[in-house]
C-alpha cells in the first residue's frame, strides 16, 4: 500500500507539521418507528452528533458522539475549536489534555490567557466530555488517513475479523412478554453467536419468562448476556442473579443503581454466580479505574462516543488488560472494532447493530455500518482511518440545523 504525496508545511527547524483549521458539528435526530424503553429510559427518537475536523492538508477526520443536549455539545465544540486551531492533529494526547483541563478549576485558570479553555460549570461536564470525544475520534481518523493505514494497524493489530454480538429485547408497549424471542432468532440467523437482552424493567417472574423464551430460540451454544440498565440494589440483584443462573448467563451488565459504588459491586460479585460488566456511563478512566481495582468486574465497558473519545478508551483498555479484566466496548462497532482487533484475547468483542430500528442514524450515515457477517464476526476493511465514508445527503436530511 503506497503513501500519498502531501504538500506539508515545514517549519524553520525542519519539522513537518499539519494544522487543524476547523471543527464542524452536525447534530442529527430521527424519530423512531416505535417508541421503546429500558429500565433506565423511554426512547422515541435517536440522536447523534457528527464531528468533522479539517486540516490545512485537506485531510478531514470524522467522529461521532451520543448524548445531549446537542446544542450544548455543539456550542462547546465551537469553544474548543478556538483552543486547538493551528495545532498538529497528530498530537492527540496534547490536544486531549488541553481540552480536558476545561472540566476542572485550576490555579490561574479563570481566563484563557494561559492558552487553555476557561473552566466550565460542573453541569456542563458531561457535554464537555462528549465534545472532547467527538474531536478525539476525528483526530484518530486523521491519524489513519495521514499514514494511509486503518486505525487497527496503527494500534499494532493485524486481525481483520472481530467477534461481535447484538443487543435487543427493548420493551415495547402492548407486546407479549415472549415477543422478543422472534427478534433474537433473527440475530442467530444473521450469524450472531452472542446476544444481549434488555432486562430490569419488570419483576423477576416476568423477566424469567422473557429470558426463557430467548434462551429456547437461540439454543444452548449462543452466549446470552443481560443488559439491566441499573435497576437494582445489591440484595435484590443477588436474588435476580441466582434466579437467572440456570439460563447460562454470560454477564450481568450495569446491574446496580447509578449511585452505588465499587464497594457495592464487590458485595454483589462475591454473591453472584454470574460475572459483572460495567463502565459505559463512566465519564473517564479515573472512575473506571476504581471499578477495575475493586476486582468486582469480569468485563469493563467504555464508550468512545459518549465520553472522552478513543484516546481515553485506549487508556482504559490497557489498564483493564493489565488487571485481567476483559475488554467489551459499548456500541459504535465502526470505531470500537479497531480497538478490539488490537487487543487479542484481552477483548471479548464489539457490540454491533443487529437491526435498524434502534440505530437508524448509524445505518444511514455510513457507507458501511459494521455488522455481523454469517461467521458471527465484524469484518474490518483496509481503508485508511476508521474506514468509513459519510453520506452527507443523509446528514442533511436528518440535521437539526435545517
What would you call each of these model-derived segments?
Residues 3-17:
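Short, Lys/Arg-enriched N-terminal segments with co-localized hydrophobic residues
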Residues 17-66, 359-365:
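Structured beta-strand/loop patches that form or line metal/cofactor-binding pockets in enzymes
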Residues 20, 58, 80, 135, ...:
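Conserved, mostly hydrophobic/aromatic
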Residues 54-146:
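Metal- or metallocofactor-binding catalytic centers and their adjacent structured scaffolds
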Residues 63, 164-167, 193-197, 224-228, ...:
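Hydrophobic faces of well-ordered beta-strands that scaffold small-molecule active sites
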Residues 126, 136-172:
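Glycine-rich, aromatic-flanked loop segments that form ligand/cofactor-binding clefts
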Residues 156, 160-272:
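Metal-dependent enolase-superfamily TIM-barrel catalytic cores that perform enediolate-based chemistry
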Residues 242, 248, 256-377, 389:
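Shared catalytic-loop signature of beta/alpha-barrel
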Amino acid at each position: 500500500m503506497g503513501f500519498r504525496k502531501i504538500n506539508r508545511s515545514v517549519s524553520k527547524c525542519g519539522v513537518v507539521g499539519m494544522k487543524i483549521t476547523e471543527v464542524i458539528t452536525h447534530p442529527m435526530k430521527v424519530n423512531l418507528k416505535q417508541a421503546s424503553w429500558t429500565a433506565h429510559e423511554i426512547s422515541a427518537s435517536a440522536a447523534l452528533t457528527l464531528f468533522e475536523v479539517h486540516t490545512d492538508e485537506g485531510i478531514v477526520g470524522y467522529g461521532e458522539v451520543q448524548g445531549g443536549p446537542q446544542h450544548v455539545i455543539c456550542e462547546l465544540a465551537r469553544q474548543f475549536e478556538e483552543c486547538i486551531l493551528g495545532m498538529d492533529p497528530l498530537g492527540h494526547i496534547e490536544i486531549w489534555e488541553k481540552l480536558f483541563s476545561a472540566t476542572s478549576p485550576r490555579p490561574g485558570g479563570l481566563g484563557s490567557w494561559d492558552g487553555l479553555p476557561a473552566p466550565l460549570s460542573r453541569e456542563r461536564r458531561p457535554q464537555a466530555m462528549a465534545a472532547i470525544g467527538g474531536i478525539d475520534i476525528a483526530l484518530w481518523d486523521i491519524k489513519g488517513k495521514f499514514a494511509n493505514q486503518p486505525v487497527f494497524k496503527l494500534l499494532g493489530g493485524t486481525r481483520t475479523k472481530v467477534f461481535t454480538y447484538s443487543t435487543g429485547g427493548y420493551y415495547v408497549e402492548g407486546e407479549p412478554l415472549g415477543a422478543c424471542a422472534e427478534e433474537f432468532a433473527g440475530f442467530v440467523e444473521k450469524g450472531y453467536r452472542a446476544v444481549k437482552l434488555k432486562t430490569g424493567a419488570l419483576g423477576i417472574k416476568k423477566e424469567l419468562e422473557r429470558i426463557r423464551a430467548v434462551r429456547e430460540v437461540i439454543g444452548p451454544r449462543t452466549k446470552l448476556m443481560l443488559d439491566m440498565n441499573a435497576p437494582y440494589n445489591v440484595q435484590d440483584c443477588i436474588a435476580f442473579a441466582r434466579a437467572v443462573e440456570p439460563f447460562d448467563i454470560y454477564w450481568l451488565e450495569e446491574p446496580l443503581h447509578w449511585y452505588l459504588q465499587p464497594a457495592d459491586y464487590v458485595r454483589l460479585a462475591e454473591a453472584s454466580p454470574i460475572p459483572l460488566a460495567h463502565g459505559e456511563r463512566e465519564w473517564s478512566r479515573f472512575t473506571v479505574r476504581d471499578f477495575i481495582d475493586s476486582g468486582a468486574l469480569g468485563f469493563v465497558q467504555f464508550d468512545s462516543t459518549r465520553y472522552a473519545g478513543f484516546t481515553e478508551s485506549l487508556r482504559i483498555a490497557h489498564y483493564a488488560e493489565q488487571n485481567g479484566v476483559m475488554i467489551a466496548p459499548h456500541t459504535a462497532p465502526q470505531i470500537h472494532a479497531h480497538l478490539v482487533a488490537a487487543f487479542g484475547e484481552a477483548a471479548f468483542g464489539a457490540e454491533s447493530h443487529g437491526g435498524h430500528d434502534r440505530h437508524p442514524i448509524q445505518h444511514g450515515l455510513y457507507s458501511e455500518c459494521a455488522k455481523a457477517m454469517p461467521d458471527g464476526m465484524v469484518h474490518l476493511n483496509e481503508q485508511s482511518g476508521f474506514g468509513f465514508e459519510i453520506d452527507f445527503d443523509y446528514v442533511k436530511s436528518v440535521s437539526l440545523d435545517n
